[in-house]
Design a protein with these regions (language model features):
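ATP-dependent adenylation/nucleotidyltransferase module used to activate substrates
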Residues: 1-187
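Short Fe-S-cluster ligation motifs
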Residues: 212-213, 217, 223, 228-238
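A polyampholytic, Gly/Pro-enriched intrinsically disordered region
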Residues: 186-190, 214-219
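Local cysteine-cluster metal-coordination motifs and their immediate loop/turn environment
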Residues: 111, 192-215
């Protein structure tokens, strides 16, 4: 029996990854791992991560990292205001991404995931692979979502853990619209995913994540079931 831990934020990428691991890679035993790092969207992220775990008959595990919010200057911090971005802002997603980037976040997440899988192995003698929903974003936007980063973290696993635990990013070479198409084929309920940095009941529609979510559905030619307070009307700039 194959065992997997999937890092999940309740977003399209990680929820699709969880479905892919369960349904296509045939991992029978699944753990959905969620991190509470004080993000402003904690409520919606946790809600949809839990729903994902329930749908896939997976165990839900939460790790607290609230100190990360205290040291971060990112807009995930509830104390900072999120401004509406224009269509022209989407021309330079690298600049916009900097505002939401949490330094070393994915490295911190994966080190904790490694500690979890090694602890499980010591106690239960069950070996777990670790899956992440990284997509093709480029080193300039998010340096901790690249193939090079995944390779280096795997190198770290080999020298820091007693067993060779693998970290796998199956969607890392494809874009958001491709992930949406894949998710549709796998039966992902996109209404039960979240992207918004604000984290209210309805997606704001104007933060970078909401803009890219709308753009992804548009180019995937898949109906977007999301309710937005502000909806994009023109995608011709992309």
């Amino acid at each position: 029996m194959k065992n997997a831990i999937v890092l999940c934020s309740g977003g399209i990428d990680s929820v699709t990854t969880a479905h892919y691991v369960k349904k296509k890679l045939n991992y029978a035993n699944l753990i959905v791992l969620f991190f509470d790092y004080g993000q402003r969207s904690i409520a919606s992220e946790k809600k949809f991560s839990r729903q994902c775990s329930k749908k896939l008959n997976a165990k839900f595990v939460e790790i607290q990292l609230k100190w990360l919010n205290e040291i971060s200057t990112s807009l995930i911090n509830k104390k900072r205001k999120v401004k509406k971005i224009s269509r022209n802002d989407l021309k330079n997603t690298e600049k916009e991404s900097e505002k939401y980037y949490v330094p070393c976040r994915n490295a911190i997440f994966l080190v904790h995931a490694l500690a979890l899988v090694e602890s499980i192995f010591i106690k239960e003698k069950k070996k777990y692979d670790i899956f992440v929903g990284f997509k093709n974003e480029g080193k300039e936007s998010y340096p901790d979502t690249t193939e090079e980063f995944v390779k280096k973290i795997n190198d770290l696993s080999q020298i820091s853990c007693q067993k060779n635990f693998k970290i796998i990013a199956p969607l890392i070479k494809i874009d958001k619209e491709d992930i949406i198409c894949l998710g549709e084929k796998l039966g992902v309920d996109f209404k039960k995913t979240t992207s918004c940095y604000i984290g209210e009941k309805e997606h704001c529609g104007f933060c970078l994540a909401c803009r890219l979510r709308q753009e992804g559905f548009y180019w995937a030619n898949v109906k977007d079931p999301t309710k937005y307070k502000t909806k994009m009307k023109d995608f011709r700039i992309v």
